[in-house]
From Swiss-Prot:
GTP binds at residues 40-47, 104-108, 158-161. One of its GO terms (cellular component) is mitochondrion. Residues 408-436 are annotated as: Disordered. GO terms for biological process: mitochondrial translation; ribosome disassembly. It comes from Drosophila willistoni (Fruit fly). This is Ribosome-releasing factor 2, mitochondrial. Its main location: mitochondrion. Residues 411-424 have a biased composition (Basic and acidic residues). Belongs to the TRAFAC class translation factor GTPase superfamily. Classic translation factor GTPase family. EF-G/EF-2 subfamily. One of its GO terms (molecular function) is GTPase activity.
Amino acid sequence: MLRYVYFNGFGMRQGLLKRCSSHILRRSYSSDIRNIGILAHIDAGKTTTTERMLFYAGKTRSLGEVHRGNTVTDYLTQERERGITICSSAVTFPWNGKRINLLDTPGHIDFTMEVEQSLHAVDGVIVVLDATAGVEAQTMTVWSQADKHRLPRLVFVNKMDRPDADFNKCVEDLKSKLETFPVCIQYPAKSNEGQLGIYDVITLEQLNWQQKDLGRSYSKLKLEPSDGLRQLQDKRNELIDQLSGLDDELADVVISTESFDKVSNELVNKALRRVICQQKAVPVLLGSAYKNIGIQCLMDAVNHYLPAPEERNEIYNCFGNELAGKVFKIVHDKQRGPLTLVRVMRGELKRGMRLTCSSGQAEVISKLYEPLADEYREVSVVSSGDVALCAGLKSTVTGDLLTSSQSSLKNAEKRFKQQRHSDGMSEEEDDDEDHHLDGLFDLAPQIPDAVYFCSIEPPSISSQTAMEQALRQLQREDPSLRVSYDSITGQTVLGGMGELHMDIIKSRILSEYKIDVDLGPLQIAYKETIEAPSLTTLSVEKEIAGTKQNVSITLELVKNQSEIFSLDKSPENLQNLNKLRPRIVQVLRKGSISALERGPRVGGQVVDTQIRLHNAIIGRGTADAFIMATAAQCVQKLLSENGTRLLEPIMALQIVAPSERVSSIMADLSRRRAIINDVLPKGDRNKLILINAPLAELPGYASTLRTISSGTASMTMQPCGFSNMNSSDESLAIRRAQGLE
């Protein structure tokens, strides 16, 4: 139910959530906790910003630097070697009376799943922008993920010390590309020497950082009229005007006062907090993490403006004082084994406590830790609203809801249902809720489709078991890693989100498990679709263990992008279908759909196809497994006899290159079946090229681009759908999939 009401915004109206949570037994807990995530495009400065936060909060004694490989949050060997974040990491630190639990997330598109998991555990986010680039491709991706979870957010415009930084462009990008309402509470103040300071719009002060003590201290200078005070006052008036249009309480104050100057800073801050928590506006701050400027103000903004745990997740109030914990990540520690990261929604987690996970398995917490990336401090209890690492949980998986017992979960469901009825819910709402009752608190992550596949082989037969164990652990940690067994080739097959993702998996198996596995050539994850509708009847009769098994089924495949399975409601078939028990229909549905997982051309998933059941005659005593297998055979027969067409994945590329290199880059792209959508100016010397190109034409393209541009161009790439192929490209793809090219 949570997936539909709260996180994804589907299902029942928000009003229902408010009605229920206002009556159900409430749990009070500390409002001094802030659970936040930090999101950005790759290389915008997320990890550097996080490292500065830890340093100024007193958690670290030296500044961690990405280029030196000594950061706290990027602790994997691969992260330090490559200078990128691969796995989300949790850190806890105090700041001005508040306790901040921060999750640093990856910026590369291959690790979007890490971001998705982390957002289940936070109450607000910081979105970091590169001041020289504005809103970039992955910024838009993570922003839409935050929208899905309805998370309040702050924007931090980083790298403002750079000569080519453009604060105004970043603000315009927020409006045009993200369709949000930015309110600037800071503006850049650059000295004649180029030293970056910050104008505080609310207090009308100029803030200047001291570099002698690594930015630990900064001065506040009250502006005089000669220092541009009038211009800053105009900005403050503009801010108040914007907020009063969004907040009724502030609007009433503005109407009753003579001028904006009479509106106190306290009233402005309170109004700002309300509109942020209601997601009516996004405050914009600025600084330079690398130059140690603006980080303290950013942490103050987290404390002042982002919501406390009790202001979110009201739906969990049905648990009262009982435990409700949300599993959002699992990591493997060499000494401690699997460690489960849990956001405690209600109740308390205690060392030695018995738990029940979503599968119904009983678990016992052997030890509890406070997170600090890959270092942990043992604690005995973790309260509501906080984040903990649990050791000893063996059956729990990402997305589970942890409760103190099955009866506790049932009582919470009962309490919630009672409240729904006492609130006078309509029949339509009631039916919708009952439909999802089995998954009332299901938080299983939505795993994106794999982009690449490849085989994986151990160095020797004796290493096979160890490799399979390593893959199980990595898959538990990273749900976007797909592991399957190909019965035709007898190989283990990996599915991943990109070349980098697969490369990292191989590297981690070597460095963490000491197994030098061999990866086969990367195969594109093509999909297949039918060319025309087709209809067939399959009758199968066998005797198994002395029992006669008899199934006759008529199925049709038609083009459809919405519903994957349906019943033919025509008069000649309706009478027969109405006689089928719902359980038999579900068995037929499950068997039919399973056959779409592997198409006849290259084994790709069959999409944009609907299975329509026309008729089914099931003999008495026929086993469900036999019915399911017959349905799958019928679909496979239709696909094999009538054929499918390939659909190839298309990637959206954004390339930034010097103007003089654009023609050579575009000439190379034209040979790769690319479609150039636009070429836009990017600063004074660069161009931004927007391209759609088939993934099959882009293996190793990052290296090619570096060669063509002599290392001056950069690119980002993300999936943007699938497209039909012409016959020659399709034939080439099939030969490549068969290893003939």
